[in-house]
């Protein structure tokens, strides 16, 4: 959906949707007959959830996504910022120090460096340690919110194995889903500075989105305190997918959520003037 209004317009006008293509073919994830943990009735479903970031450091925004399959992959942009062209999907690779991890209920095994985790949960691409390289933050195979750090090895960017360094104020690792199989995953997440204090906060799907205020880093762990939902209105069907935008250009992150009814919901940040 192209924004036709330009910057600093609180209620933009949008162009008609255009289907994304990867390797010149319409991009669509489908489970196929055995790709969904909930069975073949979902053969044509995709459950895609994504982040936009310059994953490879070439100055162009790429797409990093998860889906019904639990395979975290990316679409490299080989076009321009105004006319993107996407390559075919390729796996996000982890420099595992042993066998690649997978959910216990998966009937198939990942390849040597492949990143496989719980389905239907956002791969949040964010430079958490502020070293200039985007990291990956998302649920691991057991539902904990974990940190995949980017690093350099032999002159190339790599992704290190996950560590559970996102915790509550008591230092207990954040676990956003302890259920298994079809009930696993299903958590939509974004990271931002919601209250403007310079610390990274977290928004997690709920009736709209739950706010976890960042308390900073202590003894190697990032601490977050749950503060409740952003608003009273319930827009949830299954999951609300939260992100932040600044349509009006005031420098303050506002809430944008995609809901199961197919609509986008926008809410102005309370600290915005």
Please name every model-derived segment.
Residues 4-45, 78-118, 151-184, 215-241, ...:
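Blade-edge motifs of beta-propeller repeat domains
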Residues 50, 63, 74-77, 123, ...:
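Hydrophobic strand positions within the blades of repeat-based beta-sheet folds
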């Amino acid at each position: 959906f192209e924004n036709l209004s330009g910057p600093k317009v609180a209620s933009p006008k949008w162009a008609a949707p255009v289907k994304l293509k990867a390797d010149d073919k319409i991009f669509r994830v489908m489970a196929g007959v055995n790709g969904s943990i909930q069975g073949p009735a979902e053969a044509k479903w995709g459950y895609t959830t994504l982040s936009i970031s310059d994953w490879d450091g070439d100055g162009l925004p790429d797409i990093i996504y998860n889906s019904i399959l639990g395979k975290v992959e990316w679409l490299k942009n080989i076009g321009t910022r105004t006319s993107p062209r996407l390559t075919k999907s390729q796996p996000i690779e982890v420099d595992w120090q042993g066998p690649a991890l997978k959910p216990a209920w998966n009937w198939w095994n990942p390849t040597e460096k492949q990143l496989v985790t719980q389905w239907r949960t956002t791969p949040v691409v964010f430079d958490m340690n502020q070293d200039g390289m985007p990291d990956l933050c998302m649920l691991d195979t057991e539902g904990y919110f974990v940190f995949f750090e980017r690093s350099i090895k032999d002159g190339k960017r790599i992704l290190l194995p996950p560590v559970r360094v996102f915790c509550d104020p008591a230092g207990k690792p954040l676990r956003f889903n302890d259920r298994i199989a079809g009930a696993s995953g299903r958590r939509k997440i974004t990271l931002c500075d919601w209250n403007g204090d310079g610390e990274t906060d977290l928004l997690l799907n709920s009736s709209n989105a739950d706010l976890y205020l960042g308390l900073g880093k202590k003894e190697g762990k990032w601490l977050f305190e749950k503060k409740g939902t952003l608003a009273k209105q319930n827009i949830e069907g299954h999951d609300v997918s939260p992100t932040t935008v600044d349509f009006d250009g005031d420098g303050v992150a506002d809430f944008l959520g995609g809901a199961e009814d197919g609509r986008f919901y926008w809410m102005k940040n309370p600290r915005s003037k």
